[in-house]
Regions:
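Hydrophobic residue at a beta-alpha junction
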Residues: 37, 65-66, 79
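Acidic, metal-coordinating helix/loop segments flanking the phosphotransfer/catalytic sites
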Residues: 19, 35-56
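Short amphipathic alpha-helix used as the core "switch/output" element in two-component signaling
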Residues: 44-47, 69-81
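Negatively charged, flexible loop motifs adjacent to catalytic sites
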Residues: 90-94
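His-Asp phosphorelay/catalytic-motif detector in bacterial-type signaling
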Residues: 2, 30, 52-55, 78-83
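Receiver (REC) domain active-site loop signature in two-component systems and cognate sites
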Residues: 61-63
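Two-component/phosphorelay signaling modules centered on CheY-like receiver
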Residues: 12-34
Length: 94
């Protein structure tokens, strides 16, 4: 079964950064990565996931429309077995 990491972020550069960071794992076929640019697209992908095992969801917190914090309970309700990591590029100022 194919293992999938789903990354949810509205910034287009994120896909390039993640693919570069995990290039060895991706080339070795340890898992695949898919990218959703919004919460609704991520929820659709989660609902349609057949023949793959989602092993991790990483979501940006700050996105237009549905924020990552709004996505979190919906994704957990759909897939309570999948860990979700919230990420952000913004610091807390300290």
């Amino acid at each position: 079964m194919k293992l999938l990491v789903l990354v949810v972020d509205d910034e287009p550069d994120v896909e390039l950064l993640f693919r570069q960071q995990f290039r060895h794992d991706l080339r070795a076929g340890r898992f695949t990565m898919e990218f959703a640019q919004s919460g609704p697209v991520a929820l659709q992908r989660i609902a349609e996931a057949t023949g793959v095992s989602i092993i991790l969801i990483q979501s940006d917190i700050n996105m237009p429309g549905m924020s990552g914090l709004e996505l979190l309970p919906k994704a957990k309700a759909a897939r309570p077995d999948v860990p979700i990591v919230m990420i952000t590029a913004y610091g807390d100022g300290n």
